[in-house]
Amino acid sequence: SLPLHVLAHPQPSTSTSLAGRAGAVDLNEFRVAHRSSYASHDEMKKLPSIASFRQGTYLEVATELVKQTMPNMEFRLVDDHYVGDSGIGHVRFRQTMHGIDIDNSDFNVNVGKDGKILSHGNSFYTGPAPASNPMIKRDFIDPMQALNGVRKALNLPVKADGAHVENMSEHKVMFKGTSGALSDPTAKLCYMAKEDGSLALTWRVETDIGDNWLLSYMDAKESSKVHNVVDYVAHATFQVYKWGLADPTEGKRDILTNPWNLKTSPLTWLADGKTNFTATRGNNAIAQYNPDGGNDYENNYRPSPKNLKFEYPYSPDMNPPKTYIDASVTQLFYTSNVCHDLYYMLGFNEKAGNFQVNNRGQGGKGNDYVILNAQDGSGTNNANFATPPDGQPGRMRAYIWTRANPPRDASFEAGTIIHEYTHGLSNRLCGGPANSRCLNALESGGMGEGWGDFYATAVRLKPNDTRKTNYVKGGWVNNSPKGVRMYPYSTDMNVNPLVYTSNNKLNEVHAIGTVWCTMLYEVLWNLIDKHGKNDGPVPVFENGVPNDGKYLAMKLVMDGMAIQPCNPNFVQARDAILDADMNLTKGANKCEIWKGFAKRGLGVGAKFDPKNRTG
């Protein structure tokens, strides 16, 4: 299986380290470097050769572009191409060398509704090629040496004494007989394009150890050198805080009858097309109590009430937390399912790689609901989400927060759960459903956090809110009026002074994500001021376009995720949102989008340089 991405820790730490172990390694030292370029719609219009492309299917047009742009390059088509609900054909290619993948060298092409190329992203390697196929002489370390090298270099709690190797394909093996990982580790021989412009032959060792699901690129010539590490974890009736209430301070719980949307969950939330369930389990998610933090979720406790009445007592004053576990699991199940349904309406459907057991013949890969662990015992004061490629379940862990007395349960802070679920959204869309490794550079990883905050904030907007309304992230669960971010989200520069060049002094993804969400908050209010705000729980579409500013912003940001290149920077992600608007509305909101970004230093003159961004 391809690696996942555990992202989504809403509470920042001083470093991104391997969770829960003394002497843990700082994974920031192994982040993937930014290598992508992005040719926007405006740039594509300036290329006469593109306009003369022969007409064909969107796959043929995309393939022809790669052949012309990167002549004599070896590449393969990734099998996750699809046409999104906005009419854009998304096609991705992986560069190969001697038949071996270059794992961080991708080319994504976006073909518009008119059959012409809208934009493309490119991180193909253009340096010197290895003279010979390494498979001929096999002059590289064996995979077991690579696994042991990764274990030692990253201080992993995986034991391999007595383990053996089983071949899965020509370039991939599985390790049987290990202990300490939640599933059998694997290793795949691949190249990695390095920051210095050279190419390294590596073993990509995949280890799922719970709070971290790692893809570690061990040098295939020396077993003590790790080049990069990708972490997939960036950590009836229902009585619940209904959608739009961010936490228990914003309202009371209601009893909702059949709260699912049959257009987006036609099997309901309590069935998968084969079985009708009476517990918190269905096509989109499976939720349970997980006090030991383990991986055996199937047999864990989950509420299964008579007559499907998921109605349980809860108040924030109850203690200890396990006394209200039924209410906690129910709330987590509800919020995550509403996320599924709303994101489906906005374009995160089966073809785009969403999370469902049964895709009902609508495309994509099934068997991948979200595993929802309430009151997970593997940590406190946090939450995380692991996003493997399409076809493998996502995994969310919601923890108890100990900053208040009595402790508070993350399941009841919708902003935290929406933030986590959005990690699944952004990791499946950026780079395509088959590649969950495209938000691992520092700036792209920061945007992953920012998108989570953006959707959580947009959802909680109230009818009387204006552009003068400020919001903090994580205030209730952290028992802090300031929340867990540097500044509130605000359009007032005196309340939140963050601009693009602020990133020059930031080296942590949650901090960088705060800058990104601040920019999106500006765009959000520009669009609301132009188009109004729909305060209902679902968007209203006219010719495929949300007819209000709030849902339009959410739609354009989501479309931009699928358009942008792998591991984008802020400038490229901004351009992808502009291109999304060009495709959806013919650029009707170009000025509002530009003004929002420009106010925060990401205008026309903004330049990305990891050490000296300018704006």
From Swiss-Prot:
Keywords: Glycoprotein, Hydrolase, Metal-binding, Metalloprotease, Protease, Secreted, Signal, Virulence, Zinc, Zymogen. SUPFAM superfamilies: Metalloproteases ('zincins'), catalytic domain. Residues 1-8 form the signal peptide. The keyword Protease applies. InterPro entries: FTP_domain, Fungal_virulence_M36, Peptidase_M36, Peptidase_M4/M1_CTD_sf. GO terms for molecular function: metalloendopeptidase activity; zinc ion binding. Binds 1 zinc ion per subunit. Its cofactor is Zn(2+). Glycans are attached at residues 276, 464, 583, 612. The active site is at residue 420. It holds the Pfam family FTP. One of its GO terms (cellular component) is extracellular region. Zn(2+) binds at residues 419, 423. One of its GO terms (biological process) is proteolysis. Its EC number is 3.4.24.-. Residues 9-235 form a propeptide. Secreted metalloproteinase probably acting as a virulence factor. Belongs to the peptidase M36 family. This is Extracellular metalloproteinase 1. It comes from Trichophyton equinum.
